[in-house]
């Protein structure tokens, strides 16, 4: 044991590799809450790269308004909390509720300049306080690994937006501090089990080492099949029919014509039963492999998806920060029987690439991404590394670009996320006014949709995707939300169809999983 009471002890061991992460996740986690599967793949080759699983969590960290709720899930987590409480600044109120500790942060003044707002004490500091009390002497890249989601509605803590009600239990953010990680490298075909020990408790250390051996043993077993649930009638419903959604599009277009905004992304929700989310995720991953795929099991909800779009990515070593705006969408070129017609597909791509409306919308959002980075990056460090490429998925193709900058000294990945949220491709421009209008016209919280899911570490790295092409499942009902980018010369009927096209891959996966 280390003599340093605040040093993280890392226990690592290799285990048998298996190419199917979904099967492993089911075998090790089943429906247990506080578990998470994050996966990455190459866009064009659709080849798996890495799968990271939180098998056990030491703590659940969630936020509502200006408070953060810390709930230990093991003795390991309880000891973190005991250490953390000794370091809480006086400006932060602290109280206990049931098994949780609540931190209440001062409300952020919303009429101050960007830098003052960025450096104000905020709910993000709950993570910073936790990271600062532990030493990662060996500089292991995932010693403190926080995996989870930032909801779209987190922005209301930092900006003046209409107050909305929501019928979902999704917090402003919900993260798990990993106690047991499993990392699959699909290129090297390796499997690593990693335990992070934050406690000095000898019994807890013994338990965690025993847990590592148990997981290795389970990985040598025949993997359990993912259970299936059949549903006779799967009816798709929506909170807005085509006419209602089209009416909102037309109203927002009038505001664009008046010059109030340049672009806006209204959305609508689709609902269908989903008693078996993991089976649906398995179908989605197979039919629509994407750069980012995720499956999150919380005590209140399950969230899964296959997102084409990075939200924000930060590498602490290089201090490079990336945004990946996607704007411009077309359906894939398919025949009536659903087979891909390569000639039709290429003609659709050509039409999209040369469409003035799509190009104007895309370049506007590239410019917005550049502006987002300008606030937090070193002057002269921003550049566009990829401009107007095409990425293809099972039901749609997109115009994409990549914008990169170098983060200013004194800022970290959480500062960067706070400054850039929510991504312009899910809001519009100018961003704050677009979000205000979205709130007024949609009339309810977006929850996970349009936020971000991924991870960050104590070493400062962050990798997230925008939570789109996803299903939020609560009480066995899936909510699939999708929108369309509206500009001056948008054709409302086309945008109505686009919202359904974007949701279709997830809808089909859920249906196919329950037949």
UniProtKB/Swiss-Prot annotation:
It is an enzyme of class 4 (lyase). Mg(2+) binds at residues 361, 498. This is Anthranilate synthase component 1. Belongs to the anthranilate synthase component I family. Keywords: Amino-acid biosynthesis, Aromatic amino acid biosynthesis, Lyase, Magnesium, Metal-binding, Plasmid, Tryptophan biosynthesis. Feedback inhibited by tryptophan. The gene is trpE. Heterotetramer consisting of two non-identical subunits: a beta subunit (TrpG) and a large alpha subunit (TrpE). Chorismate binds at residues 328-329, 449, 469, 483-485. It comes from Buchnera aphidicola subsp. Schizaphis graminum (strain Sg). The lineage of its organism: Bacteria, Pseudomonadati, Pseudomonadota, Gammaproteobacteria, Enterobacterales. Its EC number is 4.1.3.27. Pathway: Amino-acid biosynthesis; L-tryptophan biosynthesis; L-tryptophan from chorismate: step 1/5. It catalyses: chorismate + L-glutamine = anthranilate + pyruvate + L-glutamate + H(+).
């Amino acid at each position: 044991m280390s003599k340093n009471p605040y040093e993280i002890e890392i226990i690592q061991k290799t285990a048998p590799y298996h190419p199917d992460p979904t099967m492993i996740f089911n075998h090790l986690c089943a429906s247990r809450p506080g578990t998470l599967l994050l996966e990455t793949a190459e866009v064009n080759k659709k080849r798996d790269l890495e799968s990271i699983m939180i098998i056990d969590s030491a703590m659940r960290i969630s936020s509502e308004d200006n408070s953060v709720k810390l709930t230990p899930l093991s003795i390991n987590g309880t000891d973190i909390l005991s250490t953390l409480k000794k370091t809480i600044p006086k400006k932060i109120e602290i109280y206990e509720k049931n098994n949780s500790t609540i931190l209440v942060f001062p409300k952020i003044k919303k009429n101050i300049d960007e830098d003052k707002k960025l450096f104000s004490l905020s709910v993000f500091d709950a993570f910073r306080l936790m990271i600062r009390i532990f030493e990662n002497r060996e500089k292991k890249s995932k010693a403190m690994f926080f995996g989870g989601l930032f909801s779209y509605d987190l922005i209301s803590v930092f900006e003046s937006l209409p107050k909305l009600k929501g019928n979902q239990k999704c917090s402003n953010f919900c993260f798990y501090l990993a106690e047991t990680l499993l990392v699959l490298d699909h290129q090297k075909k390796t499997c690593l089990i990693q335990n992070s020990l934050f406690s000095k408790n000898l019994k807890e250390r013994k338990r965690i080492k025993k847990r590592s051996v148990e997981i290795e043993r389970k990985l040598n077993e025949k993997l359990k099949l993912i259970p299936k649930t059949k549903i006779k009638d799967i009816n798709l419903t929506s909170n807005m029919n085509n006419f209602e959604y089209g009416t909102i599009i037309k109203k927002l277009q009038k505001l664009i014509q008046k010059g109030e905004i340049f672009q806006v992304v209204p959305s609508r929700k689709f609902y269908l039963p989903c008693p078996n989310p993991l089976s649906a995720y398995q179908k989605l991953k197979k039919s629509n492999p994407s750069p980012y795929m995720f499956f999150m099991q919380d005590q209140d909800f399950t969230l899964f998806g296959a997102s084409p779009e990075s939200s924000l990515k930060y590498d602490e070593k290089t201090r490079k920060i990336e945004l990946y705006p996607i704007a411009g969408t077309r359906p894939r070129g398919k025949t009536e029987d659903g087979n891909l017609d390569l000639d039709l597909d290429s003609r659709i791509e050509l039409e999209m690439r040369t469409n003035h409306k799509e190009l104007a919308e895309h370049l506007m959002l590239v410019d917005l991404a550049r502006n987002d980075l300008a606030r937090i990056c070193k002057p002269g460090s921003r550049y566009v590394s990829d401009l107007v490429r095409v990425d293809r998925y099972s039901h749609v193709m997109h115009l994409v670009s990549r914008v990169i900058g170098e983060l200013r000294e004194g800022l970290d990945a959480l500062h960067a996320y706070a400054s850039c949220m929510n991504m312009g491709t899910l809001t519009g421009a100018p961003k704050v006014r677009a979000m205000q209008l979205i709130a007024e016209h949609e009339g309810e919280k977006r929850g996970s949709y349009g936020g971000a899911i991924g991870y960050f570490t104590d070493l400062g790295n962050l990798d997230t995707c925008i939570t789109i092409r996803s299903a939020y499942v609560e009480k066995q009902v899936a909510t699939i939300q999708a929108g369309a980018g509206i500009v001056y010369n948008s054709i409302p009927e086309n945008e109505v169809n686009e919202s359904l096209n974007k949701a279709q891959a997830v809808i089909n996966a859920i249906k196919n999983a329950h037949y």
